[in-house]
Regions:
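Short catalytic-loop micro-motif centered on adjacent basic/acidic residues
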Residues: 5, 58-60, 81-84, 108-110
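Rossmann-fold NAD(P)-binding glycine/threonine-rich loop
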Residues: 72, 85-107, 118, 123-127
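C-terminal substrate-binding/catalytic lobe of Rossmann-fold NAD(P)-dependent oxidoreductases
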Residues: 3-7, 11-49, 131-177
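Beta-loop-alpha module in the N-terminal Rossmann-like domain of NAD(P)-dependent dehydrogenases
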Residues: 56-76, 87-92
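P-loop/Walker A phosphate-binding loop and immediately adjacent motor/lid segment at beta-alpha junctions
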Residues: 7, 11-16, 70-80, 85
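Short, ordered loop/turn segments at secondary-structure junctions
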Residues: 34, 86-88, 112-114, 141-143
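Hydrophobic beta-strand scaffold residues
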Residues: 28, 44, 81-82, 106-107
Length: 177
């Protein structure tokens, strides 16, 4: 059985938790969260070292700032990890890569696990290459609890086009839940 620690307990890690309940091969054993809640059968922690000690793998959907620190700690403890947190800057990614390289851990970084989003990004890149004179403007809509605006997915789409948010207008709408 693979023992999992969830770093952050927002919408995405709630979904991971629910999926883990349906799979006998994995178990969420700990959650790292600044404001712990009570969840039956799961240890809640505010300190990464304590939360990670119980797990084989860390799944991080926290904040870009916390994620960098979390993954450096995870690597130093020999814990493999999956990063779903978006918006990590180049300096943060470099810190994670350095920490990972000096240990024996493996990690996965994906700002969006949706097949549809990844196909969309590739389609946008394809169209931009073939229609270079067309104007581009980006409008994205997320639930009102989404913390980053524009989202990491929007920024990744811009990067795939070789553009920045200063070059292409980005309208980030947050509404509903």
């Amino acid at each position: 059985m693979i023992k999992i620690c969830l770093a952050g307990f927002g919408k995405m890690n709630h979904a991971v938790y629910e999926a883990a309940l349906q799979n006998a091969d994995v178990k969420v054993v700990s959650i790292l969260e600044p404001t712990p809640q009570k969840i039956e059968g799961v240890e809640m922690f505010t300190e990464p070292q304590k939360a990670f000690a119980l797990a084989d793998v860390i799944i991080d959907f926290s904040t870009k700032e916390a994620c960098v620190e979390n993954m450096c700690i995870a690597a130093s403890m020999g814990k493999n990890f999956v990063i779903g947190t978006t918006g990590i800057n180049e300096e943060g990614l470099k810190k994670i890569k350095t920490a990972t390289a000096s240990s024996s851990v493996s990690g996965v970084l994906s700002g969006n696990f949706s097949v549809g989003v990844n196909v969309f990004i590739e389609t946008a890149r394809y169209l931009h290459e073939r229609l270079p004179d067309y104007e581009i403007e980006m409008v994205e809509v997320h639930h009102n609890q989404k913390k980053d605006a524009p989202s990491g997915t929007a920024l990744r789409t811009l990067a795939a086009l070789g553009k920045t948010k200063e070059e292409i207008p980005v309208h980030a709408l947050r509404m509903g839940d």
